[in-house]
Amino acid sequence: LLLKVKKENGFCEIYYLQAPVLADLLLILQSRMAVIFQRLENQGEAYKDELITYNEALVANIPQVETAEIQQPSPERRIMSITLKPGETQSTLILVFQDEQISTLCIDDLQIEALIIGIQQALKTVGDQELVQYLSSNMDFLMCYTVDLTTQPNIDYQQYPQEDWKLNLFSHYLGVLYCCETDEGKKIVSGAVVKTSAPHLSELENNVVTRIIEKSPKLKAMHAELAPCQIFSTIIPSQPGRMLSLEECLRPLHAFYLEKKAELSA
């Protein structure tokens, strides 16, 4: 994605975002949209009018993109990573470029909707379904751990390191267990811990837990011939803004496993 930003002094800056960085940007924009909806609910028409007025001015000042900027992208303007520093009414993005230069980009909440619409339009124009699929699969949960439960009493786990700012965009940790029909009856063979904002036991959560396997090579290999017949989930308690350690994730998951295992054996 080419993102062209016009500064207040009229000077323009160009940024190039490849798929993983674009996914991070969309994650940030999505989280701010939730804040904006809340603000609309609280402030009503006054805030709605402010949004409309601002967006009209924004559209009138959209900078022109030159053909050369698309066909000959500057490698040094390619963003390699984004770190979010959230504010009350704006997001400050700390950008690391390909040449290791660091810059900041401030996005006001009033600009969020227009930016999302612009990105959606660009994706629609390109028509790359694989990219759209990749981006949408990274929007509603973050992988933390996957576990092979066939190696009891030892736990064979895989960790997926995530940045704190990203984990903070989601509301709670979710423990998931996958139960399969085996020759010895129903058995829980694998599990996962993810962070999500999908309401517990909702259709959205159901969508998340069924897609975890696809995102994990470990689980995908385990369930290639053994599809889950039942999926169990539980919220792992955590304080807002505090990241859980390995033990704080896997110990509750194991306790949940023992509880469900006992129920299946009863």
Please provide the spans of the model-predicted regions.
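Positively charged, low-complexity terminal tracts
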Residues: 1-266
